[in-house]
Amino acid sequence: DRVDVLVNNAGGAKGLEPVAEADLEHWRWMWETNVLGTLRMTRALLPKLIASGDGLIVTITSVAAFEVYDGGAGYTSAKHAQGALHRTLRGELLGKPVRLTEIAPGAVETEFSLVRFGGDQQRADAVYEGMTPLVAADIAEVIGFVASRPSHVNVDQIVIRPRDQATASRRVGRS
């Protein structure tokens, strides 16, 4: 069974509480999903990616891997750790036939906010109010671009946001 590409798309957030009110179960879930999920898949498939002679690992982190925002410490800390795992692996695999790319999206309209807010559709919809967010197809197109580069080309990192978003917490429609 040959494996050429691994897309680590492990992600998710639960809650938006300040650190002083952190829900430890939410934090545990976010770290288990974002960090350990990425680690498990990478460890499991790395030998096959190396054996392919031209493997590619794409890790979907987030702009939250570089930024912080009020109430987001559980998610941003997990995404910082996921990014650190990916960037560390980049150095550890030097000389091996595996390329690594980190894609850090901003606001992408998926079920992310619905999960974060425990199924509260109104609260989830409000996240994207007044802006045009990215959609999953935007990220898929970037993955396709990265995967189509020649084997000697490594695209280390791509940050992609909607035009309406400048930082994790600064965007059109949010006062």
Question: Could you describe each region identified by the protein language model?
Answer:
Residues 62:
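Residue(s) in the substrate-gating loop at a strand-loop-helix junction
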Residues 102-106, 121-169:
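C-terminal helical subdomain
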Residues 47, 91-94:
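Alpha-helical segment proximal to the catalytic Tyr-Lys
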Residues 42-43, 87:
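A short, exposed helix-loop element centered on a Lys and neighboring polar residues
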Residues 20, 69-73:
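Active-site loop immediately N-terminal to the catalytic Tyr-X3-Lys motif
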Residues 17-19, 26-28:
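Substrate-binding pocket helix/loop in short-chain dehydrogenase/reductase
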Residues 42, 78-81:
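Active-site helix of classical SDR
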